[in-house]
Amino acid sequence: MERDPQAHWLETETALHYARAAVRVGIWASERSLLERHFTKDQRILELGCGGGRVALGLLQSGYSDVVATDFSPIMVSLARAVLADHDEAWEKCVEQQDATTLTYPEASFDRAIFAFNGLMCLPTKAHRLAALRSIHRVLKPGGVFLFTASDREKGANAAYWAKEEPDDEIPGDRWHESDTSPVFIHSSTEAETRGELSETGFTVIECPLSSEIAADGPLVRQFAGETRFYVARKS
């Protein structure tokens, strides 16, 4: 039976896992470093795939005052609202249900956008990733910056895995793997591949370091996320 790439994100147990991470893990040191380098606290920020509210909570607690956190999953939206409201009731209104591939905001609505922890790579096909990139590009202001991460299949443990494994659907980098709840789909890209998709959708890469090249993330972050590659791209 064909597996549904969205099913994992619609489950209560998955949402609870990410809600706990919002409180226990928080913003990574590597994320914070890039946020401080490329974002300012007075900018309007769009978060895609907010999950349980980890990044949104960290941004709001750090003084970023205009944050819109979104997720396509109703249960994720519900729990993210609860997590934020537990800290400040006014923050509950910062969370909205949106599909990253078909954002409904007006053109040039945001100064910055972030799609944390490989969320873009959990979209099921290249066509979906390109649709999301075009949608994000549309709602960013001219010169706006998009920050996201992508699992790199040429580095670290990913490289060792892909040296001996075949892709699950004959597309290099596509993989279903077990989680604490249900199987989850993720695409592990190469740097050249992701740079190409960004160029195709109107973005220029500013930098794309591995998380370990930015900062020493703590043990909770390493357990939660492992190694990943950050991309910082500007709307051309």
Predicted features along the sequence, with ranges:
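Conserved class I S-adenosyl-L-methionine
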Residues: 1-40, 43-51, 58
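Core SAM-dependent methyltransferase catalytic element
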Residues: 219-236
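A short glycine-rich, Lys/Arg-flanked "PGG" loop and its adjoining helix->strand segment in the class I
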Residues: 130-142
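SAM-dependent methyltransferase
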Residues: 143-198, 206-215
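Class I SAM-dependent methyltransferase SAM/SAH-binding core
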Residues: 52-102
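A short acidic, Gly/Pro-enriched loop at the edge of an enzyme's catalytic core
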Residues: 101, 105-112
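A short SAM/SAH-binding and catalytic strip from SAM-dependent methyltransferases
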Residues: 112-127
